[in-house]
């Protein structure tokens, strides 16, 4: 009998959205009252979107665009919570286990620090695996530094 080693698979992804005045601000599956959200076909949650993309990349199951597409009515305004849930279900249906995820928000606002642990808890519960969240500014450089948009970078580990 041969023991086949479990080989972790790593995915990486980014997401970016333009800030839209007056739109609710969803970041890491949390609503940030008083901050403008991001435009998009969905809720504009760059953190959740980047993590979904990283998970799909790790499992070689496409990307966010192929997963939900743009222009599909059933996904108009879809939440990051729903996308993460459906992504977890897809990975499980293909025999994958999620090891962990890590996401960094890039932008001037909202301040993630006060709600970082809450974001980690919520996303970890959705995925059934540890998720770490961090944030950084770009010292006012680029579109995120000028508060024109937000971005996120994510990695994920899965195995079969």
Curated annotation (Swiss-Prot):
Cofactor binding note: Binds 1 divalent metal cation per subunit.
Record site: Transition state stabilizer: 41, 137
Pathway(s) of this molecule: Isoprenoid biosynthesis; isopentenyl diphosphate biosynthesis via DXP pathway; isopentenyl diphosphate from 1-deoxy-D-xylulose 5-phosphate: step 4/6
Cofactor field: a divalent metal cation
GO BP of this protein: isopentenyl diphosphate biosynthetic process, methylerythritol 4-phosphate pathway; terpenoid biosynthetic process
EC class (word): lyase
InterPro entries: MECDP_synthase (IPR003526), MECDP_synthase_CS (IPR020555), MECDP_synthase_sf (IPR036571)
Subunit relationships: Homotrimer.
UniProt name for this protein: 2-C-methyl-D-erythritol 2,4-cyclodiphosphate synthase
Source organism of the structure: Corynebacterium diphtheriae (strain ATCC 700971 / NCTC 13129 / Biotype gravis)
Lineage of source species: Bacteria, Bacillati, Actinomycetota, Actinomycetes, Mycobacteriales
